[in-house]
Curated annotation (Swiss-Prot):
Record's GO cellular component terms: centrosome; cytoplasm; intercellular bridge; spindle midzone; spindle pole
Protein's UniProt name: Protein unc-119 homolog A
PTM annotation (Phosphoserine): residues: S37, S39, S41
UniProt lineage: Eukaryota, Metazoa, Chordata, Craniata, Vertebrata
Species whose genome carries this gene: Bos taurus (Bovine)
Residue sites binding tetradecanoate per the record: Y131
Transferase among keywords: no
Length: 240
């Protein structure tokens, strides 16, 4: 299934061009505690960040995240809320103009993964990705991102992803994809088409000079209820 999205913006993916490196999956960096409305959180007694208004709101729906104007201060749902056991196992991006595969990564089957002690497992492992690109990625016009994912024994109705990209907390682009219905215990594949805008030279240079200040939130909904939230940041300098 191929999904076409309207508009353009800063896209995701990693470029396998000379001088570029693939994505490094790293633990989520410590994030500044801020409210999702864009204002800084007020001091609160006790350790830990103060939850923003969306973290206190349950359930969270698509309209809630479509109103965000800056990167969230933390994850808006826990891994346990993925009751449908949605698991992304393959990701590939290609330049739509040339057809060149820019990057491809595949998760090994469960039978080939090393055993992990549950006590040592980071609950946020796999929810944050750090990408490293060459500057040339910012000049691509259109990229296709193929995702392959499995679901558990529950039917998945109205599966939807909203992905919002920011540079220095300025919204660059919001993407909205509808996966539709997924039958239980199925493996699914679809390609999302990212149309990139023509960025100004000034903005391109700023994004290159300030690695990892380009960030994104990816929100996944089933029946208009948030069940997964992933984060990423991006460097376009071509170096770690």
């Amino acid at each position: 299934m191929k999904v076409k999205k309207g508009g353009g913006g800063a896209g995701t993916g990693a470029e396998h061009a000379p001088g570029a490196s693939g994505p490094n999956v790293e633990p989520k960096p410590e994030l500044q505690a801020e409210s999702e409305s864009g204002s800084e959180s007020e001091p609160e007694a006790g350790p830990g960040p103060r939850p923003g208004p969306l973290q206190r709101k349950q359930p969270i729906g698509p309209e809630d995240v479509l109103g965000l104007q800056r990167i969230t201060g933390d994850y808006l749902c826990s891994p346990e809320e993925n009751i449908y056991k949605i698991d992304f196992v393959r990701f590939k991006i290609r330049d739509m103009d040339s057809g060149t595969v820019l990057f491809e990564i595949k998760k090994p089957p469960a039978s080939e993964r090393l055993p992990i002690n549950p006590r040592d497992l980071d609950p946020n492992a796999g929810r944050f990705v750090r990408y490293q690109f060459t500057p040339a990625f910012l000049r691509l016009r259109q990229v296709g991102a193929t995702v392959e994912f499995t679901v558990g024994d529950k039917p998945v109705n109205n599966f939807r992803m909203i992905e919002r990209h920011y540079f220095r907390n300025q919204l660059l682009k919001s993407f909205d994809f509808h996966f539709g219905f997924c039958i239980p215990s199925s493996k699914n594949t679809c390609e999302h088409i990212y149309d990139f805008p023509a960025l100004s030279e000034e903005l391109i240079n700023e994004m290159i000079r300030h690695p990892y200040e380009t960030q994104s939130d990816s929100f996944y909904f089933v029946d208009d209820r948030l069940v997964m939230h992933n984060k990423a940041d991006y460097s376009y300098s071509g170096t770690p």
